[in-house]
């Protein structure tokens, strides 16, 4: 028997909560500087209650071949990956009109 979604009450394989959550997110992707002048890509605006940030960060890190972390609801990736991150988020189902770079 499949698990039940706690939000909508439907079985997990029929649940559309995460897809709806992806469409409603307003995401900002920007770059910043860290110690020793290293660049990082910062992704903010994703609701950590609706989308698993750790899982999304792991996906992005593997696709971009870089390190990164999740701190205070913000994903930080080592290096400047603004355009590639936007493409990957669109592939994952996020609304391209609600992603600001």
UniProtKB/Swiss-Prot annotation:
Example GO molecular function: mRNA binding
DNA-binding recorded as keyword: no
Keyword Protein biosynthesis: yes
Pfam families to which the protein is assigned, alphabetical: SUI1
Gene Ontology biological-process annotations: formation of translation preinitiation complex; regulation of translation; translation reinitiation
NCBIfam families found in the cross-reference section: PRK00939.1, SUI1_rel
Record keywords: Protein biosynthesis, Translation regulation
UniProt cross-references to HAMAP family, sorted A to Z: SUI1
TM region(s), chain numbering: none
Domain of life of the organism encoding this protein: Archaea
Family (UniProt): Belongs to the SUI1 family.
Protein name in the entry: Protein translation factor SUI1 homolog
CDD domains: YciH_like
């Amino acid at each position: 028997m499949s698990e039940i979604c706690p939000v909508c009450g439907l079985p997990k394989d029929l649940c559309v909560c995460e897809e709806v959550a992806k469409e409603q997110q307003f995401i900002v992707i920007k770059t910043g500087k860290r110690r020793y002048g290293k660049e990082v890509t910062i992704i903010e605006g994703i609701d950590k209650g609706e989308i698993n940030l750790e899982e999304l960060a792991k996906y992005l890190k593997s696709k971009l071949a870089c390190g990164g972390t999740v701190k205070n609801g913000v994903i930080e990736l080592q290096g400047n990956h603004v355009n590639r991150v936007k493409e990957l988020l669109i592939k994952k189902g996020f609304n391209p009109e609600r992603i600001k770079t």
